Amino acid sequence: MSMDTFVDERDFTLLEHDRYSFFVLHRIIEGNCRLLLSDHENLIICYTGEPYPVWIWTADGSPTEIMGKAYRLAAENGFVNNGQRFNVKYDLAEYMIRRAAEEGKELYISTNMFAYDCPEPVSPSVKADGGIHRCTAEDLDELVEFLEVFHQEIGIDRKDATGHRA
């Protein structure tokens, strides 16, 4: 099946059946995407831009043919072997890493997600000190420092203070 550059109700239905790992993709594909490809049955590829990962949705238990198509499209769009991060299921991650290695490329899947949808959050057993504060312009220096430390700790999307202020 050919790939379209739009999504429709068919895609939203696919994602609705995959709520635990790809629920947030429903919201992402409704926004501005640099790349959006879908066959409306087996494969959705979405990329909004740096510093965000490429999202590749495939159905559970997808055949090698679909995983190969996903890899080929990722490569054709410049996402393979350039340090790009991906949100993909484990089967596709393993396939893409193996395929890249066969081609003499190194590919790392550094972003894994488990669940974004949490309809019944669990309250903490111990009440934390403090409260919620909405940031204002006066909090910019503290927010930039927080972002810098956070990104240093996780080792991705590293920018200097000027980059975090943008």
Residue ranges and their predicted role:
Residues 24-25, 67-70, 96, 150, ...:
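Generic structural signal of hydrophobic/aromatic residues within well-ordered alpha-helices
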Residues 25-49, 166:
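Conserved beta-hairpin
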Residues 1-31, 82-100:
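An N-terminal domain-start capping segment
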Residues 73-77, 104-107, 133-136, 151-154, ...:
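Short, low-complexity, polar/charged sequence segments that are solvent-exposed and flexible
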Residues 117-119, 147, 163-165:
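Short C-terminal domain-edge/linker segments immediately following a structured domain
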Residues 33, 43, 50-129:
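Acyl-donor-binding surface of acyltransferase catalytic domains
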Residues 49-50, 154-166:
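A conserved beta-strand-loop-helix scaffold within acyl/acetyltransferase catalytic domains
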